[in-house]
C-alpha cells in the first residue's frame, strides 16, 4: 500500500493532539495537582502595568505576561513529555513520579520543602499545591541549588525541561502558538518545493500503511524473493545486502552497492518525509525527526543529545555544514591508529565524490543574524573567521532546516544517495526496526569456527498493523544506524568484543548568548532566520596550525529548545528573557574531545568529560562571549544555572576581563556544586571504532566486524577518534570507501 499523494503538511508533522483518548502519562490526579503547581511556579502569571497601549504587539505581550504554566492542558502535556524518558531513562520517570507523590501529602511536603510549607493556621502544614506561589518559587530556587540531595535537583531540571519545552514548542491544529508573537517568533511559511511524485516512491514500502497481507504483496512487487514461515510467524526475504539505517553512512552504502548491481534492502525505523511534508513546527518536527523526540539525556543528565531518526538520518535535519576531514586528523588516523585508508588517494577521491553528489558550495550570498554577529565580532578583535561550505545553494536562507528543508534545497541522503539506490533497484522499508543480527558458525582459519552474519531480524514499529517479523537473509549485513544504535544492536545480538559501545565521542558544546536589540544594533533579521552555519572561528592546538582544538559557530535554537536551556532564576526573569528571544544571538564552543563515554544498550548513554576538554570549553566559551561583546551586544551571558550575565554598554575593559575570568565550565546537574550547567551534543562518533587489531577496536580497516564475517559497520561509529568539526563529510566519505570494498568482495563471491 502507498500513502496518497498530497502537497499538504504531513499529518505527523502538524500541530494539535492527534489522539483524543486522554493522556498516557499515568500520573494520578494528586500528582497532576503537584506538577501543575510546579509549572505555575516556573512560569507564573505576572500581569503588566495597565498603562501599556493596546497595539497588537502589546496585547500579545500582555497576554504572555499574564499566562501561567498551570493553565490546561499545559501540565498534562508536560507530563506526556516526561513519559518519553520511560524507554531510555526509566529511573528519571520513577524519581519524578515518587517526588510528585510525596509532595501530594503534607508530611511529604514538609520533608522535601522544609519550613516554607508551614502556616500558623490549621492544618499548619500545606501540601505543595496549597503553598502560596511566592514560596513555591523559593522552593524551586532551593532545589536548583541543592547540593546534598541531588535527586531533588534532578526533579527540578526535568520538570523545568518539559514545562518550558512544551510551552514554547507546542502548536495547535493551525500551527499556531499564542505566545510566539510576544517573543518575536514566526514559523517559516515560505513556499515549499512541491513534487508530483516523491523521489523514493518506486522503491519505498512504508510499514505504517501496510498489513500482514499487503506487505508480502508489496515486497514481491519490488522484486524481492519472499517466503512465509507460518510456524515462526515471519516473512523470509532474500537479498544481496541489508543495510540497517539510512543516514550519512547507510544512504551512501546503499547507493554504492545498488549501483554495483546488488539487490539492496534498507531498513529505517523512522518515517519518510519530503519537502512539502515539513511544517517547520518545532514540537511535532522534533518528535518525529529526532531520536527520543529530541529529548535524549545522558544517564547523569549533564549531556543533552540530538540525533536524527527519520529516513535520511541526521542528514535530513542537520545544520548543512560540510567540512572535509582535516589533514591532521587523517594523519593521526593513518599513523597513530595505523589505518592506511585515511592516507590513501581513495579517501581523498571519496571526499570529492561526496561533495559533488550532495551539491556542496563554498558560497553564501546572505548570512544570517547570528553568523553576521560571529563574523563582525571576530573581525573587530582580530580573530580569523572562515566560511563554511554547505550542501545547498548559495541563496539558501533557511533557519528551519533542522526541522526538515521545506524548500528541498538542502541535499540530505534522502534526496541524493538514496535516490541513486532506488534508481538501481534498492528497496526501503520505513517504520521497520532491526531487532537482532543473525549468525551462523562456519569453518574459519586454522580449523576454528567463526561467526558469519547471515542477515537480520526486524519488525514493524508501533504505527503499523504488520504483526509478522521479517527475517532478511543476505550475503552481507551493514549496520549503519549510528553511534548510539549500532553498538546496542551488535551487543544484544551476542557479539562480545569489549570495544563495542566504548570510546563514544560526542563533541561536547557550551553556549554563550548576547542580546542585540533591533533599535540599538545594525544587524538585520532574527536568530531563527537564515543559513544556520555559514561561518566558523577555529582555535588551534598550541603545537599545530591544522588541528582545531575548539570551534565556535552559530546554532539553531527554536523557542522550545532555547527555553529549555535558559537558566531559571525566577518566573519573572524567564519571561523577561523569553521576550528577548528573537534578538538573542547564540554561539557555541565545540571541542574535539579527549574524554569519551559508552553506549551498550539503547538510550543508555554515559559520558565523562575530560579535564582537558573542560579547560578547552572554558577557553571557547570565553572567546564566544568576547566575540558577542565586540559585535555590540548590550548584554551577554552563559547558560549556567545561576543566570551568569553582564551588561555591556560602555563596559570598562577591566570589568569585562573580571567577568570573563569568572566564567567557568562547571559540572552537570548531578554534580555537588551549587551552580551547574547542561552540555549539548549533535555529533556522535567512534563507538565501534575501526582499528588495526581486535584489541583496539570493534571493526577492521574495511569496516568488517572482527568477530563476525559478513557483518560491516558503515556509520560514524567506525571513526577512530573525534573529528573536531562537523563529521558529515567524513562519515559519508568513509562509508563510500567501505561500501566500495564490500561491492568488490561481493563481485568476487559471485
From Swiss-Prot:
It is found in: Membrane. Its EC number is 1.1.3.20. Its main location: membrane. InterPro entries: FAD-dep_OxRdtase_2_FAD-bd (IPR003953), FAD/NAD-bd_sf (IPR036188), GMC_OxRdtase_N (IPR000172), GMC_OxRtase_C (IPR007867), Long_Oxdase (IPR012400). GO terms for molecular function: flavin adenine dinucleotide binding; long-chain-alcohol oxidase activity. Keywords: FAD, Flavoprotein, Membrane, Oxidoreductase, Transmembrane, Transmembrane helix. Gene3D superfamilies: FAD/NAD(P)-binding domain. One of its GO terms (cellular component) is membrane. Pfam families: FAD_binding_2, GMC_oxred_C, GMC_oxred_N. It is a multi-pass membrane protein. SUPFAM superfamilies: FAD/NAD(P)-binding domain (SSF51905). It is an enzyme of class 1 (oxidoreductase). The chain crosses the membrane at residues 92-112, 148-168. The active site is at residue 683. PANTHER family: LONG-CHAIN-ALCOHOL OXIDASE (PTHR46056:SF12). Belongs to the GMC oxidoreductase family. Long-chain fatty alcohol oxidase involved in the omega-oxidation pathway of lipid degradation. This is Long-chain-alcohol oxidase FAO2. It comes from Lotus japonicus.
Amino acid at each position: 500500500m502507498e500513502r496518497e499523494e498530497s502537497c499538504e503538511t504531513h499529518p505527523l508533522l502538524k500541530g494539535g493532539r492527534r489522539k483524543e483518548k486522554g493522556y498516557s502519562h499515568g500520573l494520578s490526579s494528586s500528582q497532576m495537582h503537584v506538577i501543575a503547581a510546579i509549572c505555575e511556579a516556573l512560569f507564573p502569571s505576572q500581569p503588566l502595568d495597565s498603562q501599556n497601549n493596546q497595539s497588537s504587539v502589546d496585547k500579545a505581550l500582555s497576554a504572555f505576561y499574564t499566562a501561567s504554566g498551570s493553565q490546561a492542558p499545559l501540565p498534562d502535556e508536560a507530563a506526556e513529555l516526561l513519559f518519553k524518558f520511560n524507554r531510555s531513562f526509566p529511573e528519571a520517570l520513577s524519581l519524578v513520579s515518587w517526588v510528585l507523590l510525596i509532595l501530594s501529602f503534607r508530611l511529604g511536603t514538609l520533608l522535601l520543602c522544609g519550613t516554607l510549607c508551614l502556616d500558623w493556621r490549621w492544618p499548619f502544614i500545606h501540601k505543595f499545591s496549597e503553598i502560596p506561589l511566592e514560596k513555591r518559587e523559593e522552593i524551586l530556587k532551593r532545589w536548583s541549588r541543592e547540593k546534598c540531595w541531588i535527586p531533588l535537583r534532578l526533579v527540578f531540571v526535568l520538570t523545568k525541561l518539559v514545562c518550558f519545552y512544551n510551552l514554547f514548542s507546542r502548536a495547535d491544529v493551525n500551527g499556531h502558538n499564542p505566545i510566539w508573537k510576544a517573543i518575536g517568533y514566526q514559523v517559516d511559511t515560505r513556499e515549499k518545493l512541491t513534487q508530483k511524485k516523491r523521489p523514493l516512491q518506486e522503491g519505498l514500502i512504508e510499514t505504517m500503511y501496510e498489513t500482514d497481507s499487503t506487505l508480502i504483496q508489496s515486497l514481491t512487487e519490488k522484486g524481492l524473493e519472499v517466503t512465509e514461515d507460518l510456524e515462526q510467524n515471519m516473512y523470509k526475504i532474500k537479498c544481496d545486502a541489508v543495510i540497517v539505517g539510512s543516514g550519512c553512512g547507510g544512504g551512501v552504502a546503499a547507493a554504492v552497492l545498488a549501483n554495483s548491481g546488488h539487490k539492496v534492502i534498507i531498513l529505517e525505523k523512522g518515517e519518510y518525509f519530503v519537502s512539502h511534508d515539513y511544517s517547520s513546527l518545532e514540537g511535532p518536527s522534533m518528535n518525529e525527526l529526532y531520536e527520543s523526540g529530541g529529548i535524549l539525556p545522558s544517564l547523569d543528565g549533564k549531556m543533552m543529545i540530538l540525533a536524527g531518526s527519520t529516513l535520511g538520518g541526521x542528514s535530513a535535519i542537520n545544520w548543512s555544514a560540510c567540512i572535509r576531514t582535516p589533514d591532521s586528523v587523517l594523519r593521526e588516523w593513518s599513523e597513530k591508529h595505523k589505518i592506511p585508508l585515511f592516507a590513501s588517494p581513495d579517501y581523498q577521491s571519496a571526499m570529492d565524490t561526496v561533495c559533488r553528489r550532495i551539491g556542496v558550495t563554498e558560497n553564501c550570498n546572505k548570512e544570517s543574524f547570528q553568523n553576521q554577529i560571529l563574523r563582525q565580532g571576530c573581525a573587530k578583535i582580530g580573530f580569523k573567521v572562515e566560511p563554511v561550505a554547505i550542501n545547498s545553494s548559495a541563496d539558501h536562507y533557511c533557519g528551519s532546516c533542522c526541522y526538515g528543508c521545506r524548500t528541498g534545497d538542502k541535499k540530505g541522503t534522502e534526496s541524493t544517495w538514496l535516490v541513486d539506490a532506488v534508481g538501481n533497484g534498492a528497496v526501503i522499508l520505513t517504520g521497520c526496526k532491526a531487532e537482532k543480527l543473525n549468525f551462523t558458525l562456519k569453518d574459519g582459519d586454522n580449523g576454528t569456527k567463526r561467526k558469519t552474519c547471515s542477515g537480520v531480524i526486524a519488525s514493524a514499529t508501533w504505527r503499523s498493523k504488520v504483526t509478522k517479523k521479517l527475517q532478511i537473509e543476505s550475503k552481507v549485513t551493514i549496520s549503519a544506524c549510528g553511534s548510539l544504535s549500532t553498538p546496542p544492536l551488535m551487543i544484544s545480538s551476542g557479539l562480545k568484543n569489549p570495544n563495542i559501545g566504548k570510546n563514544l565521542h560526542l563533541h561536547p558544546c557550551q553556549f554563550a548568548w548576547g542580546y542585540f536589540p533591533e533599535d540599538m544594533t545594525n544587524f538585520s533579521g532574527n536568530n531563527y532566520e537564515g543559513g544556520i552555519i555559514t561561518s566558523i572561528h577555529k582555535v588551534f592546538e598550541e603545537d599545530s596550525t591544522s588541528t582545531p582544538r575548539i570551534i565556535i559557530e552559530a546554532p539553531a535554537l527554536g523557542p522550545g529548545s532555547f527555553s529549555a536551556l535558559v537558566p531559571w532564576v525566577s518566573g519573572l526573569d524567564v519571561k523577561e528573557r523569553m521576550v528577548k528571544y528573537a534578538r538573542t544571538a547564540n554561539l557555541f564552543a565545540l571541542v574535539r574531545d579527549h574524554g569519551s563515554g559508552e553506549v551498550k544498550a539503547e538510550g543508555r548513554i554515559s559520558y565523562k568529560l575530560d579535564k582537558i576538554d573542560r579547560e578547552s570549553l572554558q577557553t571557547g566559551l570565553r572567546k564566544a562571549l568576547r566575540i558577542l561583546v565586540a559585535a555590540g551586544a548590550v548584554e551577554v551571558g552563559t547558560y549556567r544555572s545561576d543566570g551568569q550575565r553582564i551588561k555591556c554598554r560602555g563596559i570598562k575593559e577591566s570589568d569585562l576581563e573580571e567577568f570573563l575570568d569568572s566564567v567557568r565550565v562547571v559540572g552537570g546537574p548531578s554534580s555537588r556544586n551549587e551552580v551547574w550547567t547542561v552540555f549539548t551534543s549533535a555529533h556522535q562518533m567512534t563507538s565501534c571504532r575501526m582499528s588495526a587489531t581486535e584489541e583496539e577496536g570493534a571493526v577492521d580497516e574495511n569496516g568488517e566486524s572482527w568477530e563476525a564475517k559478513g557483518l560491516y559497520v558503515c556509520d560514524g561509529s567506525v571513526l577512530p577518534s573525534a573529528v573536531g568539526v562537523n563529521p558529515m563529510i567524513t562519515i559519508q566519505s568513509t562509508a563510500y570507501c567501505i561500501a566500495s570494498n564490500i561491492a568488490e568482495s561481493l563481485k568476487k563471491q559471485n
